[in-house]
């Protein structure tokens, strides 16, 4: 469990039985069956894999703790995201289905790619960008990312490293509510919302 930014943690998952992990395509997700204390039935949730499929020893998922609704602060925060961020301990065993999902990158195509994402929605795109950069495939990629500010800019350093390593990646970051320490041209390129 690694703290990223704000209420986001990345979880590095390894098989408890020592067997190889099933491969995945960049952009796919894991389905979790969670046994959360106080719940009468298991809770099923899906979270995107947020790292390259070229790391066969672990899966990484990055999960934001969902707060109560702004207009209903007396409501509880997100059940499964709170479980992951506040209760899950190292060496806990989770029930996970093999990677699945149809939102994945066709690594054989030569067509240009345009991604539009915001906040924690960056996770499947990050998996795809990392896989593309590691493979050396020379496809034009445009990524428009919307974030509130630098305090919530998830995986900023990894994105910047990918942008430096891949000359075909055109990263455009938009901060909707920049903070004093956020510098346009360094931390983000545009003010406002991605639209």
Task: Enumerate the language-model features and the residues they cover.
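A short, basic/flexible loop-to-alpha-helix module at the beginning of a structural domain
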Residues: 97-111
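Conserved S-adenosyl-L-methionine
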Residues: 110, 131-141
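Short, well-ordered coil/turn elements that cap or connect secondary structure elements
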Residues: 56, 138, 164-166
